[in-house]
């Protein structure tokens, strides 16, 4: 039973971390050798088989909770990736999210503190409404912060292990492959249709799941009561434009830094090589690079 | 309870000497019951509870409720389980440190437990709430409230006098710990997003620097 827990699910051998070694030492499993202990000391410190069984049952219960947590984090990540994939503007003269024209003849805009792009006031969220200087975030960066908090990444110094939803396995690959090559003209209508259907379906999911809470929070901050209908209309217009405008926003907007290093969230359940957490160390702040970010993001999925 | 429909998964860990009431406190909090019979915990265990957390904003407004799934780890206080239980310290976000008000030795060992935390927790200053348990046994009290409060102030941690038998202050202690964790989370997320070296030369430069210094000082991660 103990060997099954520590070696299951991963054919490739990975060096266990300190906590696994400590746990194995106490549970008398693994390669722990008590060379310098007398027999009497060994007998008093050893756990009885019944005690080991009880502890292993607790660890199995914890693993079941961890699986649920990984699936929940996967839903958060998928939602964020969808938002990032569906940006329509360049963030300078157009709203980053909905592509609406900004400036002298267009709508009024706000400046996102994190990604430093411009968005219209409907696609932005005021991060600190009570203070003197209003601080705005675009909805993608606000969602990024929410994912960072809700997934526990703030604690593990990186996004923990997660399981993407299985119902859309094809779409999970889309963000990593499509931006790289220049798409030919013919497949574009198909991808546009898929995007539209998915956006509409996502609207349904939002109304029924925990995502609706964040949307309610967003709508309370906005002035106009019917934002989704208006946005839906505006989403359709830019798709009718030339393909060049669709390509440029994907290259232009830089994602906020998201740290995707793996971290040990449950003792004994993960054998992946996680980085050792520095005690009291500062949070990592890598330089924002588009290619680096995407490469790191893609690595985590496979 | 066993679904993924919550906003945050928060992991707490209860520690302290054997027999101070760690299991009873967690059982009272999750199930509202008390079992006076002492059954020693074997190694490690955990309970779960779903709560709604409402943060108080700086302007006094109460924020929207957030659904928290609490995983409450219960450890064995005996010495022979020490290396097993300390392995779980790293994954805990907050700690409930218990001692027995009728047992002075368990109070004196609080210092040792805090040293264990500084060695094995995820950082050197984790969020801790100190609890003097068995406050209902007033005639057997061996630790004065002033002594315990003085020790708590020395370490800068909140102190509650709890009773697993009648449920006194147990919810308050755990809610205080949850509040500390949620505030630390907000500070960490806000701090990690401040891009360094991108302070623009405008009229708000001094304000930005002041706010950055404040936020850096607050966050202990």
From Swiss-Prot, chain A:
Modified residues (Phosphoserine): 248
Biased composition (Low complexity): 258-269
Organism: Rattus norvegicus
Annotated domain remarks: The N-terminus of the RabBD domain is necessary and sufficient for interaction with RAB27A.
Annotated InterPro entries: FYVE_2, Noc2_FYVE, Rab_BD, Rabphilin/DOC2/Noc2, Znf_FYVE-rel, Znf_FYVE_PHD, Znf_RING/FYVE/PHD
CDD domains for the chain: FYVE_RPH3L
Compartmental location: Cytoplasm; Cytoplasmic vesicle, Secretory vesicle membrane
Task of the protein: Rab GTPase effector involved in the late steps of regulated exocytosis, both in endocrine and exocrine cells. Regulates the exocytosis of dense-core vesicles in neuroendocrine cells through interaction with RAB27A. Acts as a potential RAB3B effector protein in epithelial cells.
Molecular function GO labels: LIM domain binding; small GTPase binding; zinc ion binding
Any one annotated GO CC term: presynapse
BP GO annotations: calcium-dependent activation of synaptic vesicle fusion; G protein-coupled receptor signaling pathway; glucose homeostasis; intracellular protein transport; negative regulation of G protein-coupled receptor signaling pathway; positive regulation of calcium ion-dependent exocytosis; positive regulation of insulin secretion; positive regulation of protein secretion
Residues bound to Zn(2+) 1: 95, 98, 120, 123
Identification of the protein by name: Rab effector Noc2
Region (Disordered): 174-194, 206-302
Tissues in which the UniProt entry reports expression: Highly expressed in pancreatic islets and parotid. High to moderate expression in adrenal gland, pituitary gland and ovary.
Domain RabBD as annotated: residue spans: 41-158
Oligomer and partners: Recruited to dense-core vesicles through specific interaction with RAB27A in endocrine cells. Interacts with RAB3A, RAB3B, RAB3C and RAB3D. Interacts with ZYX.
Keywords: Cytoplasm, Cytoplasmic vesicle, Exocytosis, Membrane, Metal-binding, Phosphoprotein, Zinc, Zinc-finger
Chief location bin: cytoplasm
Residues where Zn(2+) 2 binds: 112, 115, 138, 141
Zinc-finger ranges (FYVE-type): 89-146
UniProtKB/Swiss-Prot annotation, chain B:
Record-listed E.C. numbers: 3.6.5.2
Keyword Nucleotide-binding part of the UniProt annotation: yes
Binding site for GTP: 16-24, 74-78, 133-136, 163-165
GO biological process: antigen processing and presentation; blood coagulation; complement-dependent cytotoxicity; cytotoxic T cell degranulation; exocytosis; exosomal secretion; melanocyte differentiation; melanosome localization
One GO CC annotation: lysosome
Cysteine disulfide links: 123-188
Lipidation (S-geranylgeranyl cysteine): 219, 221
Modification Phosphoserine occurs at: 2
Tissue: High levels in eye, intestine, lung, pancreas and spleen, and low or absent in brain, liver, heart, kidney, and skeletal muscle.
Compartments where found: Membrane; Melanosome; Late endosome; Lysosome
Ways its activity is controlled: Regulated by guanine nucleotide exchange factors (GEFs) which promote the exchange of bound GDP for free GTP, GTPase activating proteins (GAPs) which increase the GTP hydrolysis activity, and GDP dissociation inhibitors which inhibit the dissociation of the nucleotide from the GTPase. Activated by GEFs such as DENND10.
Placement of sequence motif Effector region: 38-46
A Pfam family matched in the record: Ras
Modified residues (N-acetylserine): 2
Keyword Lipoprotein: yes
Residues bearing PTM Cysteine methyl ester: 221
Catalytic activity: GTP + H2O = GDP + phosphate + H(+)
Effect of residue 41 to S: Increased rates of GTP binding and GDP dissociation
Keywords: Acetylation, Disulfide bond, Endosome, Exocytosis, GTP-binding, Hydrolase, Lipoprotein, Lysosome, Membrane, Methylation, Nucleotide-binding, Phosphoprotein, Prenylation
Effect noted on mutating residue 78 to L: Increased GTP dissociation and decreased GDP hydrolysis
GO MF term (any one): GTPase activity
Its biological purpose: Small GTPase which cycles between active GTP-bound and inactive GDP-bound states. In its active state, binds to a variety of effector proteins to regulate homeostasis of late endocytic pathway, including endosomal positioning, maturation and secretion. Plays a role in cytotoxic granule exocytosis in lymphocytes. Required for both granule maturation and granule docking and priming at the immunologic synapse.
Family: Belongs to the small GTPase superfamily. Rab family.
Protein name: Ras-related protein Rab-27A
Record organism: Rattus norvegicus (Rat)
